[in-house]
């Protein structure tokens, strides 16, 4: 061991002057009593708070902390599951920019069906995926034009897989109503219609405003409104157009592609759709030109016919059919349906559930009225009424020349015709006989046609009602009488041909007492030369047509046996036929008026 007092170098050498090598102990600081008795005025004198505590509003603080925590969790869920629509609306161009291509999400073919939690989350994620599409910003907000960039709308339309569905969705978003709720669908592009509803997407503002003036030369009524990127047109063209023609007009006028257009005809019998157009033109954002179409006015505008349109008047239908001389059910139904756009009662009939019942009853009533009117008329009044219904003028000489061509004395024929028309007993039947192709049927048919007579057919003789048409006419024709028919007439019809009363069996009625009307016969057999029918010789007046009917070089009849010719014939020979003057038919001072069968009030509107 070395000596500690030896003078060698040590590790503490050189620290003696400026560094304390040992701590100085003080006995004073070790006394705890003196330490606490010192002055307590120091920096940590208030470290312990011995004052009385208050409760405070700890419940409100806890509620605030819970709300902040819930809001934070909700924001995390929104960022995870909701689409970035809000960000896209702030900057759609920036959102459309992508540095890396999007990869399609892959679906697992065989997912594990364990607890269902993962499957539920996947389904929710798939349902939310279609909402990622960025909607275009409207270029004309608040029904007013704007100067937005239409390229945005083109891009949004091109990005959609179903362009028609996209346009319909944007239409409903803009106008608040579906496009199909205002229109009816035409599947064919060639079907013509005068009224069209056209919706156009992303139209330039200048072209949109100019179309309001340019379309006036093509349409009777225009309804135009633009909301956002969608423009809606109701066009009532002056002539019917198909969808292709309408698209060609719109594309050339608005400089748009056909894929930007939706076009269908409007619903004409939908009150809600009519109110949409009617109330829409009252706003400041819509433009309209021309009078309302009839289908809008009838459903929205109240008038003096509104109360009548809701109820059907059967008597008005019967009155219409009577004046138009319609007796068949099919003719009444078709013609009255065509009258619907002009007549309110026809519209009410179309809306009724018992249309067929009304048509049948209308035909019955018209037949009853016509039959009663015919029985009330004399033969002079009947002929006068029927020839006045013939339009046009002819010449009576054609009939006279044809009678003379058949070697018949015209004075004798005129005398027989006068007695025939007045139903003189034993002179009530005229027979025209001769070889075939002599004009017998043509002559007889022309007379029956102008006087609205009835034709009998012996083919129905097996029925006991085959003579029923004789009770519904003023003159009748039995064409081409053969031996079986002569035998039947000689057996059963002697009294009828004499002009006496007979009992006629009619369907659904008891036998009727009546006289046969003037009966015109045509036959190839001269009954006056047959001894078997000698009892008919005194009741039938016969005229022979021996010559063939003459024809011109162009195969047209040489003698025109038309309604106009018979009209001129009766007018010219009215006095010779002993027909009464129609001005002397009624009583003096009696007013002549048309037949009225409708329950029309005296104080109704004109």
Swiss-Prot record:
PTM note: Phosphorylated. Sumoylated.
GO MF term list: ATP binding; ATP hydrolysis activity; DNA binding; DNA helicase activity
Gene Ontology cellular component terms for the protein in this record: host cell nucleus
Keyword flag Phosphoprotein: yes
UniProt cross-references to SUPFAM superfamilies, sorted A to Z: Origin of replication-binding domain, RBD-like, P-loop containing nucleoside triphosphate hydrolases
Enzyme class: isomerase
Location in the cell: Host nucleus
GO biological process: DNA replication
Domain SF3 helicase residues, every copy: 408-558
EC number of this enzyme: 5.6.2.4
Motif (Nuclear export signal): 90-99
UniProt-annotated stretches for the region Disordered: 581-606
Leader sequence residues: none
Biased composition (Polar residues): 593-606
Phosphoserine carried by residues: 83, 91
Motif (Nuclear localization signal): 78-80
Entries under InterPro entries matching the protein: Helicase_SF3_DNA-vir, P-loop_NTPase, PPV_DNA_helicase_E1_C, PPV_DNA_helicase_E1_N, PPV_E1_DBD, PPV_E1_DBD_sf, Rep_E1_papillomaV, Znf_lg_T-Ag_D1_dom_sf
Pfam families hit by this protein: PPV_E1_C (PF00519), PPV_E1_DBD (PF20450), PPV_E1_N (PF00524)
Sites of the Glycyl lysine isopeptide (Lys-Gly) (interchain with G-Cter in SUMO) crosslink: 515
Catalytic activity, reaction form: Couples ATP hydrolysis with the unwinding of duplex DNA by translocating in the 3'-5' direction; ATP + H2O = ADP + phosphate + H(+)
Region DNA-binding region, annotated ranges: 146-309
HAMAP family: PPV_E1 (MF_04000)
Subunit structure: Can form hexamers. Interacts with E2 protein; this interaction increases E1 DNA binding specificity. Interacts with host DNA polymerase subunit POLA2. Interacts with host single stranded DNA-binding protein RPA1. Interacts with host TOP1; this interaction stimulates the enzymatic activity of TOP1.
UniProt similarity note: Belongs to the papillomaviridae E1 protein family.
Entry function: ATP-dependent DNA 3'-5' helicase required for initiation of viral DNA replication. It forms a complex with the viral E2 protein. The E1-E2 complex binds to the replication origin which contains binding sites for both proteins. During the initial step, a dimer of E1 interacts with a dimer of protein E2 leading to a complex that binds the viral origin of replication with high specificity. Then, a second dimer of E1 displaces the E2 dimer in an ATP-dependent manner to form the E1 tetramer.
The protein's name in its UniProt record: Replication protein E1
